[in-house]
Amino acid sequence: MTAQTPIHVYSEIGKLKKVLLHRPGKEIENLMPDYLERLLFDDIPFLEDAQKEHDAFAQALRDEGVEVLYLETLAAESLVTPEIREAFIDEYLSEANIRGRATKKAIRELLMSIEDNQELIEKTMAGVQKSELPEIPAAEKGLTDLVESSYPFAIDPMPNLYFTRDPFATIGTGVSLNHMFSETRNRETIYGKYIFTHHPIYGGGKVPMVYDRNETTRIEGGDELVLSKDVLAVGISQRTDAASIEKLLVNIFKQNLGFKKVLAFEFANNRKFMHLDTVFTMVDYDKFTIHPEIEGDLRVYSVTYENEELRIVEETGDLAELLAANLGVERVELIRCGGDNLVAAGREQWNDGSNTLTIAPGVVVVYNRNTITNAILESKGLKLIKIHGSELVRGRGGPRCMSMPFEREDI
């Protein structure tokens, strides 16, 4: 990494030097049972314990020599002038689906009154309950303001933010600022926009942009994996469509970030397999975790760029052999989540047994709860850093989902 390229990620397994996290905040306390599906949650984490688990995750990374950055801090540091701060507030409000002009005005006044930038950022993440706003004078109310709704929020919270992997993805020296699957999560990408536009270190054009949040097709970071300095993997999943992948790849190849080939994985379109990294992660030079349930229906395409056009070939051979050939190793071992037991595989995949964060070759952060998968990984010679995640896992994401590498050593 140089001062001109503050992002440097050319593998999934190179020693992790710098990573971005988001500590769960008050947005979690704005979850309620009636609206879990709307906010893409299945359950409500206990915030106090979720924060303790997340702090322990961050400390485990620091203990391994990783510098931990926080999304909320970088976003706050990006509001470098009053004009940029006001522009951020107005853009945030324009994307918040606020019902009623008077309500929008009241929220704007609330946000403008917050003097501390980090407090402002955290408030935008938490959302705004209607009960927080002052009573609007009858003369100022429009029809939308007058028609009462039982929905308690003037602005929805963003409870998925602690999964920092998805709103944007670091690829080589560049970043994919994603357009996400749901309206609920797409609002999260505003923080990445301001970081990579205005932050003193990461803004000002220092980081090439290979995808833009204003695109209309969807892509998420859990479907973007950097296998080596030459090869990327992308998932065609519930959250990422093929059209987005084509746009992303054209931009990556045109900007000459160094990649020569992309492996596109097409698999079942459902919530339990929402991203490629929930069923497939790289843990060593020649080892991957995989969820056995995707193996039968998996289709893989090799994508290269020739004469300013994408060249796409469907691969029909063995997946392990395909990976070995593309990574330049003699053989690749696919380690099944839950082993050969379908019950264990289903349970531990649901609890993100396949969603590992590799912080050095063969050194992997995992949830301690996935005991069968963890025992198999250890039997293969991997060093596991086990973290508690009983509350964090309720959001359906593991250590890789909760982290966005900013710098890795080359391998």
Curated annotation (Swiss-Prot):
Record's keyword terms, sorted: Arginine metabolism, Cytoplasm, Hydrolase
Pathway(s) of this molecule: Amino-acid degradation; L-arginine degradation via ADI pathway; carbamoyl phosphate from L-arginine: step 1/2
InterPro entries named in the record: Arg_deiminase
GO molecular function per UniProt: arginine deiminase activity
Compartment(s) of residence: Cytoplasm
Biological-process GO terms, alphabetical: arginine catabolic process to ornithine; arginine deiminase pathway
Reaction equation(s) it catalyzes: L-arginine + H2O = L-citrulline + NH4(+)
Protein family membership: Belongs to the arginine deiminase family.
Protein name per Swiss-Prot or TrEMBL: Arginine deiminase
Organism in which the protein naturally occurs: Streptococcus equi subsp. equi (strain 4047)
